[in-house]
């Protein structure tokens, strides 16, 4: 009795395996994949450009660059004065 049940199941499984993947599961063709690469690169470049522009605008509107520039200028002037007094 088990052989009679196992044989139809085996036939169905074998038929499914030999049929291959369904069309929706089939791997895309190489040519279509390679054809989409320039579009994907352009999209990536545009996204990167937008994010970079937003970051630069954010830094321009921030007061951190001005404070940093002032701190470096003040520190440089202090060091310069100390060197002047030390070697004079």
UniProtKB/Swiss-Prot annotation:
Record's signal peptide: 1-26
Subcellular location: Secreted
Gene Ontology terms: biological process: lipid transport; lipoprotein metabolic process; negative regulation of cholesterol transport; negative regulation of lipid catabolic process; negative regulation of very-low-density lipoprotein particle clearance; triglyceride metabolic process; very-low-density lipoprotein particle clearance
UniProt keywords, alphabetically: Lipid transport, Secreted, Signal, Transport, VLDL
GO molecular function: fatty acid binding; phospholipase inhibitor activity
Keyword Transport assigned: yes
A single cellular component GO annotation: very-low-density lipoprotein particle
Chief location bin: secreted
Its job: Inhibitor of lipoprotein binding to the low density lipoprotein (LDL) receptor, LDL receptor-related protein, and very low density lipoprotein (VLDL) receptor. Associates with high density lipoproteins (HDL) and the triacylglycerol-rich lipoproteins in the plasma and makes up about 10% of the protein of the VLDL and 2% of that of HDL. Appears to interfere directly with fatty acid uptake and is also the major plasma inhibitor of cholesteryl ester transfer protein (CETP). Binds free fatty acids and reduces their intracellular esterification.
Family, similarity comment: Belongs to the apolipoprotein C1 family.
Name of the featured protein: Apolipoprotein C-I
């Amino acid at each position: 009795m088990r052989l009679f049940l196992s044989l139809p199941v085996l036939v169905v499984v074998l038929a499914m395996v030999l049929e291959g993947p369904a069309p929706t599961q089939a791997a895309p063709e190489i040519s279509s994949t390679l054809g989409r690469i320039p579009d994907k690169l352009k999209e990536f470049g545009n996204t990167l450009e937008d994010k970079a522009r937003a970051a630069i605008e954010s830094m321009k509107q921030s007061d951190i660059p001005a404070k940093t520039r002032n701190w470096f200028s003040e520190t440089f002037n202090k060091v310069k004065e100390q060197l002047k007094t030390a070697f004079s």
